[in-house]
Amino acid sequence: GNEFATIICSPNHLEELVLGFLASEGVISKIDELESIQIDDSKGGARVELTHQLGNFFDYSTKRMIASCCGKNREFYFQNDAVIAKTSMTHIELLQNQVLNMMTQLQGASNIFKQTGGLHNAAISDCNDFFEHRQDIGRHNALDKLYGYCIQTVSYTHLRAHETREDL
């Protein structure tokens, strides 16, 4: 197999991180596309076997693409991002107090942040309560862990994910 990525991360929920990362990169779109996944905590690595070939995926995943960004165009750094990105047509309205309340709840649940002074948190919420919460030293990792959790366990079309960065 080929090495796909090196990720510097917090050492928890690693299978979720791998699943979420592969999905966010467009390698998989559902858990059924995995033949197997093995996490080796002692070596800090993961081995994944897919049910399908990647074909020319690596040609697009590393090719830079810079769009003009005029009007509704969007800038993508890699060509593969343009292939997998989808525009959300969901209309969401949040009240200011909902956002502040969720942020306070999320910060209160972050024991590691309280101990270390810096960490990224992400949560799945219905705009009132949190259903699931992940932490990581990398903000994208925290989101990928939640994405992996969703792929493994829930139908998340009715849920919203959001992130807060906590600093001193």
Where are these regions (language model features)?
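General alpha-helical segment detector with a strong preference for membrane-spanning helices
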Residues: 24, 166-167
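Conserved small/polar residues in nucleotide/adenosyl-binding loops
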Residues: 157-166
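Alpha-helix N-cap/helix-start and coil->helix boundary motif
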Residues: 14, 139-140, 166
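Small-side-chain structural scaffolding
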Residues: 18, 46, 122, 142, ...
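Glycine- and Gly-Pro-enriched alpha-helical subdomains that act as flexible
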Residues: 115-118, 123-156
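Intrinsically disordered, low-complexity regions enriched in acidic/Ser/Thr/Pro/Gln residues
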Residues: 2-125, 132-133
